Amino acid sequence: IDGNEAVAQVVYQINEVIAIYPITPSSPMAEWADAWASEGKPNIWGTVPTVVQMQSEGGVAGAVHGALQTGSLTTTFTASQGLLLMIPNMYKIAGELTPTVFHIAARSLAAQALSIFGDHSDVMATRGTGFAMLCAASVQEAHDFALISTRTTLESRIPFLHFFDGFRTSHEINKIELLTTENLQTFIPNELVIAHRSRAFTPDNSFTRGTGQNPDVYFQGEEGTVIYYIACQASLKSMDEFAQMTGRQYQLFEYHGDSTAERVIVLMGSGCETVHETVDYLNTLGEKVGVIKVRLYHPFDSQRFIAALPPTTRSIAVLDRTKEPGASGEPLYLDVVAALYEAGEQLPKVVGGRYGLSSKEFTPGMVKAVFDNLAATIPKNHFTIGINDDVSHTSLDYDPDFNI
């Protein structure tokens, strides 16, 4: 089973309205949902989800927003420019504290050129919308997080982007442990669904939403959502409940490596798998290295991130699968730097780098080069890995023949 089908199998069964407009590499998720609806396949409540194809991703976002206002459990799948067209509605959905999950096969954006391949450029463009962001690193995680994100959005009322790497994960065929219908029914309590229904616009439950506000109250309204984002981090305790149900334990920030590691790489997405295996190999050679896999990117829980770091950490490399021209650093790097600075403790050296844009290969040799850079007296910051940058000279040298 590939990543797209693994996600679609869960999503179809726990939603009532699925608005679609196909875009590579997320299209198979929409195709699966459409096919199952045509066959009359029911969800866990015994009804056949309504799958509707709109005229564009902008139309999809409007349809999702509207369906959510009726109390329907609603979702969509998209990527890249399609996700960008949804941003205006995403601000409204998040601002109105409306539970939903958008499932994203993360893909490059068309900038200096178009590319259909995977990186995190699209999801990072939505950081200001107010959506929480949960990242899966494998087909199994994508399958599981499709359920965990839905449970958490219903509990917290914070909408979610559940994303995984386009092609590298969305089209990877792997053997996984599938969630059963009983698992889904157990993990989505009826009281959460009823609570979502109770906020629907109906003649019997009339109230005002989406008003125009003036300076006397708008600021207060914006700040009033803070408690929901704090609660959202706590809501992911459902990961522990998921572990009891399936035996698969996930953490918001998962550390893997030597317990006394001095050099640590921080990243999210499919690259975590490569770093994980390379860390194991390097530690057998006597190195003291580790990796932190970021699952919940937004809202970023600084305290849990600090707690996940080994106390022996002396240097950190934060790897982003995106580029933000003109910024002082890439998104994950900036969040990590802020978390460490605000902790007020002895700060390890932190450098940031870019890798894997447009599905550029990310190999064990590249991981070793990043760790070697961290061992330098003055590590290179804002580096690239995986290319030969003979223009701005940001790239790290690596051994293409290194293998594990």
UniProtKB/Swiss-Prot annotation:
InterPro entries: PFOR_II (IPR033412), Pyruvate:ferred/Flavod_OxRd (IPR050722), Pyrv_Fd/Flavodoxin_OxRdtase_N (IPR002880), THDP-binding (IPR029061), Transketo_C/PFOR_II (IPR009014). SUPFAM superfamilies: Thiamin diphosphate-binding fold (THDP-binding), TK C-terminal domain-like. Keywords: 4Fe-4S, Electron transport, Iron, Iron-sulfur, Metal-binding, Nitrogen fixation, Oxidoreductase, Repeat, Transport. It comes from the Bacteria. GO terms for molecular function: 4 iron, 4 sulfur cluster binding; metal ion binding; pyruvate-flavodoxin oxidoreductase activity. Its EC number is 1.2.7.-. It holds the Pfam family PFOR_II. It catalyses: oxidized [flavodoxin] + pyruvate + CoA + 2 H(+) = reduced [flavodoxin] + acetyl-CoA + CO2. One of its GO terms (biological process) is response to oxidative stress. The keyword 4Fe-4S applies. The keyword Lyase does not apply. It is an enzyme of class 1 (oxidoreductase). Belongs to the pyruvate:ferredoxin/flavodoxin oxidoreductase family. Oxidoreductase required for the transfer of electrons from pyruvate to flavodoxin, which reduces nitrogenase. This is Pyruvate-flavodoxin oxidoreductase. It comes from Nostoc sp. (strain ATCC 29151 / PCC 7119). The gene is nifJ.
